[in-house]
Amino acid sequence: MKRFALASMAMLAACQPPSASKDAGGESSSAPVSGLERAAIESGAIPDSAHISPVGLFRRNHEAGSDSLCVMPDADGQFRFGLEAVFGEEPNCRGHGSARRAGDKLILSFKGGDRCIIVAQYDGDQVALPGVVDMACADLCEGRGSLEGVSFPRIANDAATALRARDRGGKALCEG
């Protein structure tokens, strides 16, 4: 029985993913990639999201309205952004600020108010906000609107398209 337990523990340990390696600068900044995904990236079958700029327009149209996020290049390798999420006639969220990449994350720092910061998932094709956001972000929304869990699929990857994006009131989403 002891041999069976020992063999079972050894097999379970072999099934665990390798821990993220640390370099002299700290933890690895990108998500671990499986061997199959790495092979697909190296063969060119799929793009490496770590090398895809977030500049462009991300938008999802749905029955209640449209959710839009534009990302523009800014100084020092940073970005600026504007977003609007619409949940029907009244509830909506709108804000703008600066953004920066951190591995597979896009850190959105909103201007004004209570200093809302959202760490979004970015995979090259989509920006997905987390299911829970800081209470400081409530000021960005009217009515019962919330940015929790909102996702924005990419529709364009150029700054010109992002600059032309408008909110539902016709104002520029990414302020020049």
Specify the residue positions occupied by each region the protein language model found:
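Sec-dependent signal peptide recognition
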Residues: 2-7
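Contiguous, well-ordered beta-strand patches that form the walls/edges
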Residues: 87-137
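Tryptophan-anchored aromatic micro-motifs
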Residues: 31-69, 129-131, 151, 162-175
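N-terminal glycine/threonine-rich, aromatic-flanked beta-hairpin/loop signature
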Residues: 66-101
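C-terminal motif of bacterial Sec signal peptides marking the signal peptidase cleavage site
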Residues: 12-14
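Bacterial signal peptide processing site
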Residues: 16-18
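Extracellular/mature segments of secreted proteins
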Residues: 23, 77-79, 100-103, 124-125, ...
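Short, hydrophobic/aromatic-rich segments at coil-to-beta transitions
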Residues: 51-59, 77-80, 101-109
